[in-house]
Curated annotation (Swiss-Prot):
Presequence positions on this chain: 1-41
The entry's keywords: Acetylation, Heme, Iron, Membrane, Metal-binding, Mitochondrion, Mitochondrion inner membrane, Phosphoprotein, Transit peptide, Ubl conjugation
Lineage of the species this protein comes from: Eukaryota, Metazoa, Chordata, Craniata, Vertebrata
InterPro entries, A to Z: Cyt_c_oxidase_su5A/6 (IPR003204), Cyt_c_oxidase_su5A/6_sf (IPR036545)
Protein's recorded name: Cytochrome c oxidase subunit 5A, mitochondrial
Function field: Component of the cytochrome c oxidase, the last enzyme in the mitochondrial electron transport chain which drives oxidative phosphorylation. The respiratory chain contains 3 multisubunit complexes succinate dehydrogenase (complex II, CII), ubiquinol-cytochrome c oxidoreductase (cytochrome b-c1 complex, complex III, CIII) and cytochrome c oxidase (complex IV, CIV), that cooperate to transfer electrons derived from NADH and succinate to molecular oxygen, creating an electrochemical gradient over the inner membrane that drives transmembrane transport and the ATP synthase.
């Protein structure tokens, strides 16, 4: 994993944009490649999956969360290279309901489907786990709304 990060950094440090915007490799990687590779990783402690889930559930369960914080949290969560756990999505959907933001609930479910990508079994599993919450809050899935046909 560290080797891959170092390779990515070394490649990034040895390429530049040409006149047509294409990337060209430099002939010799200078000292910048070595400096750049050191900056591509952190020596900080790693967050466990349980701590990650708890942090996001706590974030979305804040009683005073506003619409901007909700969207910021959703956008940040979507940028991670993973599908959020159903308990995180549950907390986000409940925050949307507290704010009466139905559009965000649909966006969250669409983002989960998109993040699942080619793994067709993930999205139905998440919907199955969230079904009691969806029924309780009166939230329809994008498929129930016909948005998957557009």
């Amino acid at each position: 994993m560290l080797g891959a990060a170092l390779r990515r950094c070394a490649v990034a440090a040895t390429t530049w944009a040409g006149p047509r915007g294409l990337l060209h490799s430099a002939r010799t990687p200078g000292p910048a490649a070595a400096i750049q590779s050191v900056r591509c990783y952190s020596h900080g402690s790693q967050e466990t999956d349980e701590e990650f889930d708890a942090r996001w559930v706590t974030y979305f369960n804040k009683p005073d969360i506003d619409a901007w914080e909700l969207r910021k949290g959703i956008n940040t969560l979507v940028t991670y290279d993973m599908v959020p756990e159903p308990k995180i999505i549950d907390a986000a959907l409940r925050a949307c309901r507290r704010l009466n933001d139905f559009a965000s609930t649909v966006r969250i479910l669409e983002a989960v489907k998109d993040k699942a990508g080619p793994h067709k079994e993930i999205y139905p599993y998440v919907i199955q786990e969230l079904r009691p919450t969806l029924n309780e809050l009166g939230i329809s899935t994008p498929e129930e709304l016909g948005l998957d046909k557009v």
